[in-house]
């Protein structure tokens, strides 16, 4: 158990060879986080090795989203250390490795320009940016993004604007984005939020394939609903 009632469970592990520092995807040592003198997290320790699938489970309001921010390089601890894919948070430019981290979260969803095309919101994961700026992407990049959209049943969203999407549609766009760059660390924060029954079934079926993967990718799924943990994580 982590701080504040967050339960960390390692549901699926596929590792080979000798365990060493090179096998660690994420490590939190004595992490604490305070906001305006309020203690949000205290003495959090967690080690996730490559190829492991973890579920962080607990009710809303106990610090799960704060943990997600730190694990995805978008927040810093008040005390303690966070090592992500061999990089010490705060010591290395996060943009040098952020595209190796796939993130789906409501907070990230609010970072896109309102008129962003969902297709661009997905493909820009390759450069870890939110918004089409000066970066260029290939036809193959867009083909992969469209393939992910089909897998999650949202191909019809191409050409629309992010601010016009429903919560469930935005959630599926963010999951596609998280998978776009074949990340070494995949973090899915409440990946079924806002989904209707049909969208939920499509998403859980696709995420079950992620859970069944035999690869070095580390996956962390954050949820407050046990019934929404995809197959392959149990």
Q: Can you name each region flagged by the protein language model?
A:
Residues 186-189:
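Catalytic Walker B motif of ABC-type/P-loop ATPase nucleotide-binding domains
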Residues 108-164:
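ABC-family P-loop ATPase nucleotide-binding domains
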Residues 182:
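Conserved catalytic motifs of ABC-family nucleotide-binding domains
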Residues 72:
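Helix-to-loop junction immediately C-terminal to a conserved catalytic motif
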Residues 80-90, 97:
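Conserved ABC transporter NBD signature motif
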Residues 57-59:
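The feature captures the beta-strand-to-loop junction immediately N-terminal to the Walker
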């Amino acid at each position: 158990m982590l701080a504040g009632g967050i339960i960390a469970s390692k549901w699926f592990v596929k590792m080979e060879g000798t365990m060493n520092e090179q096998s660690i995807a994420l490590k939190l040592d004595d992490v604490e986080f305070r906001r305006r003198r309020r203690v949000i997290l205290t003495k959090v320790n967690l080690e996730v090795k490559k190829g492991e699938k973890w579920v962080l489970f607990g009710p809303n309001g106990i610090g799960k989203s704060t943990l997600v921010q730190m694990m995805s390089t978008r927040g810093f601890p008040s005390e303690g250390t966070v090592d992500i894919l061999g990089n010490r948070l705060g010591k290395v430019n996060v943009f040098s490795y952020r595209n190796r981290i796939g993130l789906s979260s409501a907070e990230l969803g609010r970072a896109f320009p309102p008129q962003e095309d969902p297709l661009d919101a997905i493909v820009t994961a390759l450069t870890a940016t939110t918004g089409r700026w000066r970066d260029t992407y290939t036809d193959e990049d867009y083909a992969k993004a469209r393939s992910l959209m089909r897998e999650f049943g949202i191909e019809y969203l191409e050409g629309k604007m992010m601010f016009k999407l429903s919560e469930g549609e935005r959630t599926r766009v963010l999951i596609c984005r998280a998978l776009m760059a074949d990340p070494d660390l995949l973090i899915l924060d409440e990946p079924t939020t806002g989904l209707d029954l049909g969208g939920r079934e499509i998403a859980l079926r696709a995420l079950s394939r992620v859970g069944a993967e035999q690869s070095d990718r580390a996956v962390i799924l954050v949820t407050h609903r046990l019934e929404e943990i995809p197959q392959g994580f149990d």
